[in-house]
Swiss-Prot record:
Encoding gene (name): grip2
Species assigned in the record: Xenopus laevis (African clawed frog)
Name by which UniProt lists this protein: Glutamate receptor-interacting protein 2
Tagged with keyword Cell wall biogenesis/degradation: no
Tissue specificity annotation: Enriched in the mitochondrial cloud of stage I oocytes, before becoming concentrated at the tip of the vegetal cortex in stage II oocytes. Expression becomes localized to the germ plasm of stage III-IV oocytes and early cleavage stages. At the tailbud stage, localizes to the migrating primordial germ cells (PGCs) until PGC migration is complete (stage 40), at which point expression disappears. In the adult, expressed in the brain, ovary, eye, muscle, spinal cord and very weakly in adipocytes.
Disulfide bridge partners, by residue number: none
Biological role stated in the UniProt entry: Plays an important role in primordial germ cell (PGC) maintenance and efficiency of PGC migration.
Family: Belongs to the GRIP2 family.
Amino acid sequence: MHFFQTILRWKTAKGQKSVTFKKDDGPYSKGNKDPAGNDLALVSRRQSIPEEFRGVTIVELIKKEGSTLGLTISGGTDKDGKPRVSNLRPGGLAARSDQLNIGDYIKSVNGINLTKLRHEEIISLLKNVGERVVLEVEYELPPGTPDNSSAIIPKTIEITLCKEGNSFGFVMRGGAHEDWHKSRALVVTYVRPGGPADREGTLKVGDRLLCVDGISLHNITHTDALSILRQCSQEGVFQIEYDVALMDTVTNASGPLLVEIAKTPGSTLGISLSTGTHRNKQVIVIDKVKPASVVDRCGALHPGDHILSIDGTSTEHCTQMEATQLLASIIENVKLEILPAHHSRLPLRPPETVKVQKSDHHHCWDPCVNYCHTPHPGHCKTPTWNPTSNQDYCKSLVAANFSSSSVAGTPGFSSQNSNTLPRTVHPMSPRTTMNRRRQKRKDHKSSLSLASSTVGPGGQIIHTESTEIILRGDPLNGFGIQLQGGIFATETLSSPPLIRFIEPDSPAERCGLLQVGDRLLSINGILTEDGTLEEANQLLRDAALSNKVALEIEFDVAESVVPSSGTFHVKLPKRKGVELGITISSSRKPGEPLIISDIKKGSVAHRTGTLEPGDKLLAIDNIRLDNCSMEDAVQILRQCEDLVKLKIRKDEDNSDEQETSGAIIYTVELKRYGGPLGITISGTEEPFDPIVISGLTKRGLAERTGAIHIGDRILAINNISLKGKPLSEAIHLLQMAGETVTLKIKKQTERIFPQRLSDSMNEGSDPEDDLTDSQKTSKLSEIYSTTVPSVDSALESWDGSGIDAGYGSQGTYVPQAVGISLHPHEWRTSRQKSNTPPVEHRKSYPFLDGSFNEQDWEKPTRYPSQPNGLETDHDDSFWRVFGEALEDLETCGQSELLREIEASIMTGSVQDLGLDSSQILLENSSQGGHVLFRRGSHHISSNSPKKENKLSQDARSKKEEVHNAQSLTTELLKVTVQKDMDTDDFGFSVSDGLLEKGVYVNMIRPGGPADRSGLKTYDQILQVNHVRTRDFDCCLTVPLLSDAGDRLDLVISRGLSIKAEEMGVEQIKGPLRMETQTSTKTL
């Protein structure tokens, strides 16, 4: 470690403070010490090394005939202790090997133990040992790096050293050890005078070696590190870590300081000077500080500090050259009177936080003080301070406009206009270490901004948001980010640093999510606000070594104009190779425009504040997209340069504003207390279809609030918007919501309920066939449900296996338009009046902890002989009793038992319900569209919708082939496949479906594990080891299969038609109806 001793001398009479920095080279340095003195000191200090601090190394020396080792040994059985190195002759073989330190103990020479030898015997042995000398050396391990010291901070630097023999002119000790108590960093314990490291001048005793020629020395033993150094070329690039002192005296100084620094004769301080103007007077300022120099390490001087005097000589009338010459003429102790930079200019913070108060000390640089020409400024005679002039001057400081570009004249900063203002400064936190800051709670992880609107640059109304960005760079070029914050590098920041500059064609620019002026909140989880600018830069440099960094940034989003509906234009700046941040989706439905399906947070598109998912893209640069495909639109965008003009249409249904068509929006907070919410939500996997509440449990939590009703649309769950999210994501959010669930509800004051279609109506007489596309869109927007028939997911064991009435005969995805009855009592009445259940059901997901609503299910007891002649039998005692039992459990407070039942249902364990899960049949009648779920003697039926969609001719032909197939039947099976250890595979391949989502068995190796397990070609894989794969493609499913281990548990869907093998997977697996096909492209 490299230490500095600080002595404070308070001079109350003259109003000055004095700080003295004396260099202490630590216990390993011997350059300027008398060898005899070292010997005596070591005798008193080190008779032996405690085991926990003892290190051992092997030193091999090759001496020429007639030459000596240049090594002085003291000790022996007849002397004062164990044999040890008491002196190394400068220029001798032992000194130039750079492997020995004075004070090292010699245990053995060429395998001969020295413990029981007298002093003369040891000397004789060394003289007659031969050309090759192998020494076993014990040394004291270097002290560990302090973890919680707030008085120093580490920095790193790369230096290049020339090799001299097999070494670079320094001794290092430490390294990894099998006993973790003895593991240390590789620490420099001695720099040989005149050696390569000494001539270069940067490396000092106490510095840690991190890397050599790109080879990391982390967790490397001392022996391996020496071997790496010997194998280096003639020029080695070293990355070293050194310590910089944090001087509270300097940071908290209220006026000039007298700084005394001791340096080695012939060495330089490591500062360069320049001239500047302060209060209309020319001053000498520190322009730059050389990294790892004496000045940098002491932490007392910083760029921007004013030098008032050098060794008592005033610099008021000195030129830059004269001041530099004056510094160079000082041999050892340098005495400088400085004015720290934070007292010579405005602090980097908004003007309302600037506080100017009268100083008790008057110096030659004050505008109201007559300077008396004396080399001792403390002896100046000063007149009485003029309060009035001081007050006026303070007013002018506070009234001055402040911006991030106002520090352009400050050394070390360049003028950059920021489009984001610094945040309001909070009270400065106490200085903490990086480890403590890493454990601090983040306050910026909300996905929705909770901050209120503020006024930004130019009077624009903005709000702040934050996001996390992953950048990938390289150690040579980094990430392309330059930061700005504070006055000097070691000042503790009271607000996060700003991004000052983004390098062209760097990872930061190419990601398209960063802009100049953004606030950097954290780097790899470490908050930047309580650290220093140098620490932030160091974190970026360290992250570059691993080629990856996670940045949390805060930025401004404009909200001066936020259109709720209508058509408008948006202009976005575009740079070559940088994404706009929008993802567009194309719908196959004729006449439907392209849709913005996603917007990257932090992108140019997001910061405008006017675009949101669901907006329609009508034109790009005045080129209408009516007849353009998504690929054409992408091509048009790629050809745009500098500025992109987008024509956008926002529908009222895509707006969350309360002013839209009489909607009322409010927030409801539900506290579960371990119980169920009591709601059933419905929706589809289409990203912009609404998610509504389709059922409420009688006397349940949601119903008791009186604020939630059937038909209400859910806009957000726990402040996470559902816009652009499918039903599955909404379900996941509810499952992960915890004890408190906050729902943002949108209620239509005038609800339009869908009219039920006649039971006798067939597909050809669908009344919606006569509607135009725009009328269909309007109608669907009035209905709270637009797709997927209803299957209650309380039986999650079925849903987890891919069984869903919204999926075709093979469990494939069929996005079909359906409605929902919003009045359960009407539904129940209609069931009593008619044997045919309602035509339109929705895909519903109740959150009732496993309770079943009687009205949600139809339970026929036998399969009808005629497709259109379904007979409904109300002898459904099992399901009625089961549902009533669950309701009784809920009302009597048995929530724990309810949760156990829910757990068994959610994990797919049908056996827990007393049902036979060995085989589940889903039979689809080709004419009536009725779907039956059969389990043992219990049957559940629901109806498929009868909407006819406009299909392409090719799709129609495939559909007709499926309709012509005889009584298609779907069988769902659980299959276990054991891996073949000889071939290390499961013996089958998979492929994607052609007309629908899903993964299917493609080929099976005869006699292989899959063949022996009963797997068949064309089986659809619905679940892999309890992971649903029904909506996956091969890219997502194959990794699951690869990581399955030796056992594969599959849930498959198998078609039993006699024509299955003849028609092929694309025909059998194809859905009976197809409304839309959506593809996406990220721009």
